[in-house]
Amino acid sequence: MKIESTRFGTLEVTSEQIIRFPHGIPGFLDEKAFVHLPHDENSPFSFLQSTAEADLSFLLVEPFSFIPEYEFVLGDEMAGELELSEENPPQVFLIGTVREKITDMTVNLLAPIVVNRNKGIGRQIILDKTEYSIRHKLFPEAQAQGTPEGGE
């Protein structure tokens, strides 16, 4: 199938590349189907592009590359809904926001995206009883002295 993206142009994707979000994504509840687009093979950055809305895409960040201590408990009900198992482990992503400079990039630790790639289903979950922030700086001040590759 072909999808249009204002960021990536026309994309040819297979049904296996589609990730379904039965509950939508908070703020975009009508958007149920997205395609995951890695930035490159070894990058912790990727994009989640809506299959229906050309101008709707999210920057995703693989959290453990930057925040190895990031953890949360996924309840049995949620694990069951996503059909997670040892054979179908979760992939976890954070939605990122780039400010004027890449060194000011923040990620939402409070609402991770959890995906079962083998089954093609995902959900953004809202964590409770946590001190995680919705605007966690990805590059702490100590690292901000040197700009990451591709930054300004």
UniProtKB/Swiss-Prot annotation:
Origin superkingdom: Bacteria
Membrane-spanning segments: none
Q: Does the keyword Cytoplasm apply?
A: yes
**Cellular-component GO terms for this entry:** cytoplasm
Keyword set, alphabetical order: Bacterial flagellum biogenesis, Chaperone, Cytoplasm, Translation regulation
Q: Name one Pfam family in it.
A: FliW
What does this gene product do? Acts as an anti-CsrA protein, binds CsrA and prevents it from repressing translation of its target genes, one of which is flagellin. Binds to flagellin and participates in the assembly of the flagellum.
Provide the protein name. Answer: Flagellar assembly factor FliW
What organism is this sequence from? Desulfitobacterium hafniense (strain DSM 10664 / DCB-2)
Give the lineage: Bacteria, Bacillati, Bacillota, Clostridia, Eubacteriales
